[in-house]
Design a protein with these regions (language model features):
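Amide-forming acyltransferase catalytic core, primarily the GNAT-like/NAT-type
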Residues: 115-195
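Conserved acetyl-CoA-binding loop-helix of GNAT-fold acetyltransferases
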Residues: 68, 74-88, 110, 114, ...
C-alpha cells in the first residue's frame, strides 16, 4: 500500500537509509523538511519499506529521495512509487516529470527508461572549499530567457528558467556574471533550504578565464559569508582550480506525462 508518510514512519525508513552511498545518506537530514512540505510517500508491508518525495509545481513534478529496503528489492516497488506520483501529477494536469539519477547507477537508469523516462541533460556536481580569494571581477546583473539557460538548481531541485522564474531571480539580485572577455560565465546563487550554511550555485560556464574568475568570486563569497559548503551544479566540465573537486555526475531524466 502506498500512502502519505507520517512522523512515526521515520524510524522504519531511516533503518534502511544509512548506507545508500559510500558516505552514507541524507534522508535523515531532510525527512522533517519533506514531511512538512507534504507529498512524502511511503510504501508499506506491515512496516514502511520504501519512500519517495514529490514536489509539484505549475509545469512539472520533481521526484526525489527514492529508497527501497534492500530486503524487498526486485519487487518493482520503486516503479510503483514513481507511477503513483505520476498519477497524482496527471490529476493536477502537470505535463512533465523529472528526476535525477547518478550516471553510474545503471539499475535505476534502466528502471527509469522502462517507465518512459529519457535523459534530458547531464549535470556535474562540484564542491568548492570557501577561502579568502579577492582576485576576481564580477557584476550582479539581470538575465533574460535564453535557450542555453534551461534550468537552475534550488535546493537540489531543477527548476525551469521561464520568464516568471527569471523575473523572481532578477528581483532578488542573486545572479552574477563574469565578463572580463567574450563568452561570459553566469552563476545563480541560492541558500539551501535543508542544510545550514550551504550555498547552492548553478553555474553556466563561459570562457576559461570567465569561468575561473567566477569560481574565485564564489570561493571568496563563501569565505566572507561564512558558508561551510559551496555546492556547484553545472552542465560543463570545469577547469582545474584549487579546492574545486568533482564529486559526481547525474542524468536529468524527463518523462512527458501528456
Amino acid at each position: 500500500m502506498i500512502r502519505l508518510a507520517k512522523s512515526s514512519d521515520k524510524y522504519h525508513i531511516l533503518k534502511f537509509c544509512k548506507n545508500t552511498f559510500s558516505w552514507g545518506d541524507y534522508i535523515q537530514d531532510v525527512w522533517d523538511h519533506w514531511l512538512s512540505e507534504g507529498n512524502l510517500l511511503v510504501i508499506e508491508k506491515t512496516n514502511p519499506i520504501g519512500v519517495c518525495h514529490a514536489v509539484f509545481s505549475k509545469n512539472q513534478v520533481w521526484i526525489e529521495g527514492i529508497r527501497i529496503n534492500s530486503d524487498f528489492k526486485r519487487q518493482h516497488l520503486a516503479s510503483n512509487l514513481i507511477s503513483k506520483v505520476e498519477s497524482l501529477a496527471i490529476q493536477k494536469q502537470i505535463p512533465i516529470s523529472l528526476m535525477l539519477i547518478d550516471t553510474e547507477n545503471t539499475p535505476s537508469l534502466l528502471m527509469a527508461q522502462n517507465l518512459g523516462y529519457k535523459i534530458n541533460q547531464t549535470w556535474k556536481f562540484y564542491s568548492l572549499s570557501p577561502r579568502e580569494n579577492p582576485s576576481y571581477e564580477i557584476s550582479y546583473e539581470k538575465i533574460i530567457q535564453n535557450n542555453n539557460l534551461s534550468h537552475y538548481v534550488k535546493s537540489w531541485r531543477w527548476i525551469p528558467l521561464d520568464n516568471d522564474t527569471i523575473s523572481s531571480l532578477n528581483s532578488k539580485n542573486c545572479i552574477v556574471q563574469s565578463k572580463i572577455e567574450k563568452d561570459p560565465a553566469i552563476a545563480i546563487l541560492g541558500d539551501s533550504e535543508h542544510f545550514e550554511k550551504t550555498l547552492i550555485v548553478t553555474l553556466f560556464a563561459g570562457s576559461k578565464n570567465n569561468t575561473m574568475n567566477i569560481i574565485s568570486f564564489l570561493q571568496n563569497f563563501g569565505f566572507e559569508k561564512k558558508y561551510q559548503r559551496l555546492q556547484i551544479l553545472t552542465k560543463e566540465t570545469l577547469p582545474e582550480f584549487r579546492d574545486l573537486e568533482h564529486k559526481i555526475s547525474f542524468h536529468l531524466m524527463q518523462k512527458l506525462l501528456s
